[in-house]
């Protein structure tokens, strides 16, 4: 999926400014995302792809021996962020139809669990969970366990009963929704991901990120992409 022609034009127009550092706080992009989703800018985090946000979350949240619960198979980076920090990857097999086993995931949460990740739609199987099922799942978890819902492929779901989880995120103090411009907007090579999160989480991510983690052209492209 290529980017919109208007995005290409915006990037080319901005190319003469690549000798200047990017906005380290990504204020314009974060404001554009906040406006899109009806949130405050303080609830928006951006990174050099969603991978970057997951790595930052690992740096901010995980210590040696902490547990992270997620499905198996799912996005391979989840296991990697655990391994690099000495955290324990608690991998719950998918059900026979390749759906998340949410009951087993909830049962796997212990006092050592810091993070639960739900990839929805799941990568690589493509199965998705209705928002109501995710809400019921979150209700079973302690509020001190952070839940990240990875919606990297949300733009590709055509089912009538599909609902994203941004409404759920607004209602729960321990839920983040992570997304990317790589898939639906065709910007994989520029690396832009974003999270809609409680401000405690965005503040924690900001403390551990590099100051210029999203380059100038990527910010221009993402802002323009949101207009289409």
Where are these regions (language model features)?
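N-terminal small-domain helix-loop-helix segment of the aminotransferase-like
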Residues: 1-51, 56
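Short acidic capping loops at alpha-helix termini that bridge into adjacent secondary structure
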Residues: 40-44, 64-67, 112, 144, ...
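PLP-dependent aminotransferase-like
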Residues: 60-118, 132
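Active-site pre-lysine segment of PLP-dependent enzymes
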Residues: 102-111, 124-147, 151-187, 200
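PLP-dependent aminotransferase class I/II
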Residues: 4, 10, 25, 174-228
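Short glycine-rich anion-binding loops that position phosphate/pyrophosphate groups of nucleotides
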Residues: 1, 50-51, 75, 120-124, ...
């Amino acid at each position: 999926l290529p980017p919109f022609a208007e995005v290409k034009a915006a990037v080319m127009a901005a190319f003469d400014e690549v000798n200047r550092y990017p906005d380290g706080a990504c204020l314009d992009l974060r404001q554009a995302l906040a406006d899109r989703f009806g949130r405050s800018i303080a609830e928006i985090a951006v990174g050099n792809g969603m991978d970057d946000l997951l790595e930052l979350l690992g740096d901010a949240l995980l210590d040696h021996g902490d547990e992270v619960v997620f499905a198996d198979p799912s996005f391979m980076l989840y296991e990697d962020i655990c391994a690099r920090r000495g955290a324990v990857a608690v991998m719950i097999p998918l059900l026979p139809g390749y759906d998340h086993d949410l009951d087993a995931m909830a049962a796997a949460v212990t006092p050592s669990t810091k993070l639960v990740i739900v990839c929805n739609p799941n990568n690589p199987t493509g199965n998705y969970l209705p928002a109501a099922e995710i809400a019921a799942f979150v209700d079973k978890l302690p509020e001190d366990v952070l839940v990240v819902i990875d919606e990297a492929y949300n733009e590709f779901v055509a089912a009538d009963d599909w609902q994203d989880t941004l409404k759920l995120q607004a209602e729960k103090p321990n839920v983040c929704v992570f997304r990317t411009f790589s898939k639906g907007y065709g910007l994989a090579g520029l690396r832009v991901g974003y999270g809609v999160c409680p401000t405690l989480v965005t503040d924690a991510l900001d403390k551990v990120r590099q100051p210029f983690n999203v380059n100038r052209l990527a910010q221009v492209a993402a802002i323009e992409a949101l207009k289409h």
